[in-house]
């Protein structure tokens, strides 16, 4: 569970505000925002769909495939 920082008097400090990755609307990061970092379930599902359709990806090393001249065929 994420806890917001508290001051010496045990009162919450300024809430953390993040931008929704989908629509860029400001969202308070806390228990009252169940879809954080997204502002709504809709924005959360839009993001999930983009990952599922491979519109988003995590950069990494390129795949070596047959088109790159690599093959499982050893030529025996």
UniProtKB/Swiss-Prot annotation:
Function: Inhibits all the catalytic activities of DNA gyrase by preventing its interaction with DNA. Acts by binding directly to the C-terminal domain of GyrB, which probably disrupts DNA binding by the gyrase.
Region listing for Disordered, in residue ranges: 54-76
Composition bias, Acidic residues: 65-76
Record family assignment: Belongs to the DNA gyrase inhibitor YacG family.
Quaternary structure note: Interacts with GyrB.
GO terms for biological process, alphabetical: regulation of DNA-templated transcription
Keywords (A to Z) from UniProt: Metal-binding, Zinc
Organism: Photobacterium profundum (strain SS9)
UniProt key word Zinc: yes
Official protein name in the record: DNA gyrase inhibitor YacG
Cofactor binding note of this UniProt entry: Binds 1 zinc ion.
Residues noted as binding Zn(2+) in the record, renumbered to the chain: 20, 23, 39, 43
GO molecular function terms listed in the Swiss-Prot or TrEMBL record: DNA topoisomerase type II (double strand cut, ATP-hydrolyzing) inhibitor activity; zinc ion binding
Cofactors (names): Zn(2+)
Signal peptide (UniProt feature, chain positions): none
């Amino acid at each position: 569970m994420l806890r917001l920082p508290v001051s010496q008097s045990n009162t919450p400090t300024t809430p953390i505000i993040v931008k929704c990755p989908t629509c860029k609307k400001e969202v308070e990061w806390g228990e009252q925002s169940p879809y954080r970092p997204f502002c709504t379930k809709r924005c959360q599902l839009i993001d999930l769909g983009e990952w599922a359709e491979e519109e988003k990806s995590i950069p990494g090393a390129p795949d070596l495939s047959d088109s790159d001249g690599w093959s499982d065929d050893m030529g025996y």
